[in-house]
């Protein structure tokens, strides 16, 4: 197998060239056409002693050699995104900015059949968290904000780089008819080529890109510790934050 990369201006692609051997050329052709159809997308998963990664691409060519003494076919796969992404259980890292402390214990006493006096758990909100990133190159994140009550004007910070992302809830109210209310979810994707911010409310999704400050920074993780914090003008304790990220490598 040959693995390399090639550049087109500032755009880098990775190319796989794989040679497959079998008993007869007919067997090879049929199997290769089944698993590597021309111009179709494929995902390659690679496992080594210390890495389990995947990479996506498309089949550039699938060329059986009918004149060779040893039957085979050469398959070329182009990967426009040249990075290997962590796969399996390590494919997605999740950092919660809150914890749920269990409060219910035996024996217990319920003093009322109508009032909700029993406490089963208590949510502890954290406004700062650390994401330790082990990848070879910077990568974007997906930020999830769940509201358990109203909140206004949310600011998210990378305390190391001083980057900030500001969500204007006054603009949100003008756009959707309400500010941020209980059960709302905001999903922010800072991944290159996929940047977006979406409000999910009562099963409907809204593009709220216009609610971001015009000078908003789109966060990326760099190798090592990345410290994020968030604030709100009001209702900060009504916000539950979660940040998810993948890990990318330049090689295996």
Language model features with spans:
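Hydrophobic residues positioned within well-ordered beta-strands of beta-sheet architectures
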Residues: 13-16, 55, 73-75, 141, ...
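Short beta-strand and beta-hairpin "edge-sheet" elements
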Residues: 38-89
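Short, solvent-exposed beta-strand/turn "edge" segments of beta-rich domains on protein surfaces
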Residues: 5-6, 64-70, 131-134
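A short, compositionally biased
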Residues: 36-41, 148-151
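Single conserved hydrophobic/aromatic residue that forms the stacking wall/gate
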Residues: 1-15
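N-terminal assembly/attachment segments of tailed bacteriophage virion structural proteins
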Residues: 16-26
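Intrinsically disordered, low-complexity segments enriched in serine, threonine, and glycine
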Residues: 92-252
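Short amphipathic alpha-helices in soluble, non-transmembrane regions
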Residues: 28-35
